[in-house]
């Protein structure tokens, strides 16, 4: 006979047995604590979570009473000069990085006196083939073909404005065989034909690492060759388009200098991505090793919610520190401040003076010892 054993033995104290096997509760982790501080399920249902997760700059755009670092506040663009520059830009069908990149200094640069008002013209259209996580310029794999009249129109606009110094920048055009290098060179040549006295700075791309294209632009007649590193080496893969590398950008600046040693070479760094002091120092050393003359520091400001969040709003005092540090390392000129941008005009007067002295072979130009703070903060 088969004996049948009950499935459950009622004599066993089930509850007590389960209780004795319960492990002690784990300590809360840092992640859990931070998660509990954030929005709850009810916040998401009510719609409050969205506001709880926005950074101060985003909130300030919606709520005038929200806290925003005072050094990041700028005046509303207005004035006769501002509207005149805007009119010329529209009439000649030009693009400007001032508008496309939502530059905070547009009211100062466009709204200055006639001798000071300027716009940084963006060549090769208003659409980039790359998609860096900090940039608000439109992107597309196949932008419209470059306007063949753009070099002539650009030269005409610059002649109208009566400038002594002009900055040209460009979108990346990986869809073009030469990356747009010859178009940029032609624009510089047209400007020099119409107004030989004008000093020209070009903020160019990396041409996919084709250094022959760098040489074409360097030999076009420009006076300042600028190419931006944007950030430190460790953060580059997370911030810039994957086709742009830190070492490739250094190679561009180095080749430009070797091609024409009289050129002033220039680059810019944005702070606020979470970079460390050690990483910034390493970047400055790398730049000095390749003979880069000018560096600028500015605060990264998130253009839209689709872009990288700001990790830190760097104080004006910290920007002063990096200005002094870079000057001590031997840079010819340094512009450093929350609202400074790569094409910001704060340094142009000094660079213009340096270049004019070089044109007239007036010995060695001494390095600038003191740089005035930009008036925008």
UniProtKB/Swiss-Prot annotation:
Radical SAM core domain sequence ranges: 113-332
Cofactor dependence: [4Fe-4S] cluster
Binding-site residues for [4Fe-4S] cluster 2, renumbered to this chain: 128, 132, 135
CC annotations in GO: mitochondrion
Positions with a binding annotation for [4Fe-4S] cluster 1: 98, 103, 109, 343
Pfam name, any one: Radical_SAM
A GO molecular function held by the record: 4 iron, 4 sulfur cluster binding
Catalytic activity: [[Fe-S] cluster scaffold protein carrying a second [4Fe-4S](2+) cluster] + N(6)-octanoyl-L-lysyl-[protein] + 2 oxidized [2Fe-2S]-[ferredoxin] + 2 S-adenosyl-L-methionine + 4 H(+) = [[Fe-S] cluster scaffold protein] + N(6)-[(R)-dihydrolipoyl]-L-lysyl-[protein] + 4 Fe(3+) + 2 hydrogen sulfide + 2 5'-deoxyadenosine + 2 L-methionine + 2 reduced [2Fe-2S]-[ferredoxin]
UniProt cross-references to SMART domains, sorted A to Z: Elp3
Keyword Iron: yes
Subcellular location: Mitochondrion
Coarse class of the protein's main subcellular location: mitochondrion
Annotated keywords: 4Fe-4S, Iron, Iron-sulfur, Metal-binding, Mitochondrion, S-adenosyl-L-methionine, Transferase
Matching SUPFAM superfamilies: Radical SAM enzymes
Note describing how the cofactor binds: Binds 2 [4Fe-4S] clusters per subunit. One cluster is coordinated with 3 cysteines and an exchangeable S-adenosyl-L-methionine.
Pathway this chain belongs to: Protein modification; protein lipoylation via endogenous pathway; protein N(6)-(lipoyl)lysine from octanoyl-[acyl-carrier-protein]: step 2/2
EC number: 2.8.1.8
NCBIfam families: lipA, PRK05481.1, PRK12928.1
Database matches in HAMAP family: Lipoyl_synth
Protein family: Belongs to the radical SAM superfamily. Lipoyl synthase family.
Miscellaneous note of the record: This protein may be expected to contain an N-terminal transit peptide but none has been predicted.
Protein's UniProt name: Lipoyl synthase, mitochondrial
């Amino acid at each position: 006979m088969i004996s049948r054993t009950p499935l459950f033995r009622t004599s066993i104290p089930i509850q007590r047995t389960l209780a004795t096997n319960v492990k002690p509760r784990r300590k809360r982790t840092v992640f859990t604590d931070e998660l509990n501080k954030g929005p709850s399920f009810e916040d998401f249902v009510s719609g409050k979570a969205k506001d709880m997760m926005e950074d101060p700059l985003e909130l300030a755009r919606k709520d005038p009473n929200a806290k925003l670092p005072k050094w990041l506040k700028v005046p509303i663009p207005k004035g006769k000069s501002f509207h005149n520059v805007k009119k010329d830009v529209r009439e000649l069908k030009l693009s400007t990085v001032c508008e496309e990149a939502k530059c905070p200094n547009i009211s100062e640069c466009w709204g200055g006196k006639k001798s000071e008002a300027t716009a940084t013209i963006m060549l090769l259209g208003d659409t980039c083939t790359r998609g860096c996580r900090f940039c608000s310029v439109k992107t597309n794999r196949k932008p419209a073909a470059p306007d063949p009249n753009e070099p002539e129109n650009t030269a005409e606009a610059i002649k109208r404005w009566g400038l002594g110094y002009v900055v040209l920048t460009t979108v990346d055009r990986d869809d073009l065989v030469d990356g747009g290098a010859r178009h940029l060179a032609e624009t510089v040549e047209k400007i020099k034909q119409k107004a030989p006295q004008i000093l020209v700075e070009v903020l160019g791309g990396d041409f996919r690492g084709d250094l022959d294209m760098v040489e074409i632009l360097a030999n076009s007649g420009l006076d300042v060759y600028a190419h931006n590193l944007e950030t430190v080496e460790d953060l580059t893969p997370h911030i810039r388009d994957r086709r742009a590398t830190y070492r490739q950008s250094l190679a561009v600046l180095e080749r430009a200098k070797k091609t024409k040693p009289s050129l002033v070479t220039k680059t810019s760094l944005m702070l606020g991505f979470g970079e460390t002091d050690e990483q910034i120092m390493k970047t400055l050393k790398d730049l000095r090793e390749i003979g880069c003359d000018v560096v600028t520091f500015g605060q990264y400001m998130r253009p839209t919610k689709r872009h990288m969040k700001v990790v830190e709003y760097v104080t004006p005092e910290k920007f002063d520190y990096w200005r002094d540090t870079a000057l001590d390392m031997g840079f010819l000129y340094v512009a450093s401040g929350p609202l400074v941008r790569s094409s910001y005009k704060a340094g142009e007067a000094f660079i213009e003076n340096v270049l004019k002295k070089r044109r007239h072979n007036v010995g060695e130009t001494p390095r600038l010892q003191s740089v005035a703070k930009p008036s925008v903060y």
